[in-house]
Amino acid sequence: MFYLNAHLEINKVVDVVMSLSKKFLKPSVASNQLRLLFTAAERKVNYPGHVPLSPLQRIFLVAGSAIMGLKAPWRGGDMISVLGDASGQPFFLHRLLNKMLVDKTGREILKDKPRMTSKSLNLPFLRTLPPNTLGKIYVDWIDKEHVGPDTRSPTRFVDDPEEAYVMQRYRESHDFYHAICNMPTNIEGELAIKWLEFVNMGLPVGALSALFGPLRLNCEQASRFRRVYIPWSIRNGLNAKTLINVYWEKELTNDIEDVRRRIRIEAAPPLV
């Protein structure tokens, strides 16, 4: 029911965006260039599920999803995903794609284009691994937090297929950041990971969550977050390998301390 309601809210925001763009458009006086600014009718669908947007529609969608994401951060998964799609173009996703293209593992990921699902990750197998392995720690973490790899929204509003995959990979890797850093999914844990993602990869959706999310913390939580977790996130975000270039599926049987050492990331201070 939660998942359905989240998607209904997304569709509501998208419907408002489309109707506003039509309201602003006056065909009798608009030039062809102006029409292209307001309407996506001339734009082609580039991959299954792609929703083309005009520049104005993209602005509306960024604003609407940002407001909804801030209003209800506990539902942030789907609405923040829309914000990530809409705000990543035209600069930020292209820059992240370039970071993958200049990295050997990044190029391998782009060539293979793996998707993370319960089936592809083989969760029953991960439960049989030794307790010190990344795979075992990951599957224990998702069991404890009651999350899973099948709940990530598909990319819809990114025009370029390669950049759309980069956004999908960014989204699907999120739980591995939690698991390898030993960070829960409560508000403080999510914000710490968003700070880490923003500093490390620079997508604006991370900046929005990182900058405005702490407003949802009480005084004690906010003080601890400023003293402990923001410094941890910034230090690790700057020091770590670009996390989009980690081929998590090939690290599952490896010792987690070895993985942390190679990607230069620390476990977070315990969040209790």
Curated annotation (Swiss-Prot):
Catalytic activity: 4-hydroxy-3-methoxy-5-(all-trans-decaprenyl)benzoate + H(+) = 2-methoxy-6-(all-trans-decaprenyl)phenol + CO2
Record keyword Metal-binding present: yes
Names of required cofactors: Zn(2+)
Pathway the protein acts in: Cofactor biosynthesis; ubiquinone biosynthesis
Keyword annotations from UniProtKB, A to Z: Lyase, Membrane, Metal-binding, Mitochondrion, Mitochondrion inner membrane, Ubiquinone biosynthesis, Zinc
Molecular function terms, GO-annotated: 4-hydroxy-3-methoxy-5-polyprenylbenzoate decarboxylase activity
Record InterPro entries: Coq4, Coq4_euk
Protein topology in the membrane: Peripheral membrane protein
Residues where Zn(2+) binds: 174-175, 178, 190
EC assignment: 4.1.1.130
One GO CC annotation: extrinsic component of mitochondrial inner membrane
Enzyme class: lyase
Alphabetical list of Pfam families matching this protein: Coq4 (PF05019)
Annotated GO biological process: ubiquinone biosynthetic process
Entry's localization field: Mitochondrion inner membrane
Additional free-text comment from the UniProt record: This protein may be expected to contain an N-terminal transit peptide but none has been predicted.
Assembly mode: Component of a multi-subunit COQ enzyme complex, composed of at least coq3, coq4, coq5, coq6, coq7 and coq9.
Protein family (similarity comment): Belongs to the COQ4 family.
Function: Lyase that catalyzes the C1-decarboxylation of 4-hydroxy-3-methoxy-5-(all-trans-decaprenyl)benzoic acid into 2-methoxy-6-(all-trans-decaprenyl)phenol during ubiquinone biosynthesis.
Name of the protein this chain belongs to: Ubiquinone biosynthesis protein coq4, mitochondrial
Organism listed in the record: Schizosaccharomyces pombe (strain 972 / ATCC 24843) (Fission yeast)
